Amino acid sequence: MQAYGKRQPKANVSSDSTAVADNEMSVMLKNITVTASRGVARKTPIAMSDVDRREVENKLGNNELPEMLNQTPGVYATKNSGAYGDSKLNMRGFQSSNVAVMVNGVPVNDMEHGGLYWSNWGGLGEMVRYMQTQRGLGASKVSVPSIGGTVNIVTKTTDSKRGGYATYSVGNDGFNHVSASFSTGLTKSGWNFSMLFGKKWGDGYIQGTDFTDYDYFFAVSKRLGQHHQIALTGFGSPQSHYQRNQYDGLSVEGWQDVKRFMGGKSVYRYNPTYGFGKNGERKSSAFNFYHKPQFSLNHIWLIDDKSSLNTALYMSIGHGYGNSGQGINSAYANSWYGAANGKLRYDFRHADGTFAYDQVQELNEQSDAGSKMVMAQSFNDHIWYGLLSTYTRQLAKGLDFYAGFDVRSYKGTHTAKISDLYNGAYYTDLRYRSSVNPANNAAALDPNWQYEKLSVGDVVFRDYDSHIVQHGVF
């Protein structure tokens, strides 16, 4: 509760409510605004846990946000391949595709496969007000398949106090983090504005997994009379990072095999696809760039002292790619991987253990039929917008009624484009073009299309759109 004046009388505020002052002469609140649904630990009849802001501040450091939930019963978070933003989150044994993840009550799971890429939310840790998990089927106010559970991440928004800060921190493996934040607090005219900007960069714990991440966040809200409030929130984390491919895992024997490459360092830091080209330039078959900003406009209507209506209109625009090694046949395509069946691959391998990208370049230079192996950027762009509205009514003490609807529309564009011919003259994508159905692409009617000589920027491997419309009630 916030109050103005010297007197601050007591007021009963429900656990999922945030109280704000009506005007500067107020000595107590007349209205209560619901900004996010939140259960009460040990009082709500669901298996739930909270992680508050203080705990996040104490433990985050250069860890990733899902790792803050590792002390939560039924939750298991891991760095997965070890690169920046590549964390995985399981709940009750279920993968993220069966765990509903929301930011301020807005769903963020991928619309196509249900998974989640935590690298898209690299800067979210600084914005967190609290995180709440519900294990198993619970009371989430969104129509999603969440048999594993629900994670709701609530950011600092309309409750931010006046002030700001600037920080710079360092950590192991070249980790650097600089950020600045400012908030006006609630003004006399009912406005509240908050913003945050930051940057993270470092070498990564795993060999050759350096990263750069920019973070931004803003929230602006306005009280409209006695019973209405609107809030506009936006955040994003454009990032790029080298990876250790999740399919390059080694067996116990395989890890011992690479011990000779690490010079006394932990064998588990070894990266099978770390390497350089002929001129000493950095090359990688495992690199990711992505930017997925999300914006939401919320309207909150306090109908009376027992009921409210919360409506959110949101939009997310995603753009980015991951490297995708291509080859004229499966043998060459698989050679881009650093391991197979738990064992290190030696197709293209130097004596020091680095991946021999220079040998790929030499292979293509010696070919009279164009490149045998090329690198492509596999784009996954999308535009996603939705509307989520929830009506809440307190029927009796300890008994609430919820009803609402959830509508979403999504278009994804999936294209792979050649980014590096690796010193070859051209590339032919006969491997995939030969199987294209003319009903899907009229160009396949031309027999010469399969043998087209392709260069940097040309499409290979895949080129399709996906359209999804989802609606539900609860």
Which residues does each PLM region occupy?
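N-terminal periplasmic "start-of-domain" segments of outer-membrane beta-barrel proteins
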Residues: 14-15, 26-60, 88, 96
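Hydrophobic, lipid-facing positions within transmembrane beta-strands of outer-membrane proteins
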Residues: 30, 87, 149, 162-164, ...
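Structural signature of outer-membrane beta-barrel domains
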Residues: 39, 96, 108, 156, ...
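Extracytoplasmic beta-strand/coil segments of soluble accessory domains associated
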Residues: 66-107, 123, 129
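Short acidic/polar hinge/loop motifs at secondary-structure boundaries
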Residues: 88, 107-135, 154-156
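Transmembrane beta-barrel wall of Gram-negative outer-membrane proteins
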Residues: 163, 170-201, 206-245, 294-304
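Acidic/polar loop-and-plug regions of large Gram-negative outer-membrane beta-barrel proteins
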Residues: 221, 229-296, 323-377, 440-454
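Outer-membrane beta-barrel transmembrane strands
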Residues: 279-324, 371-406, 413-414, 458-474
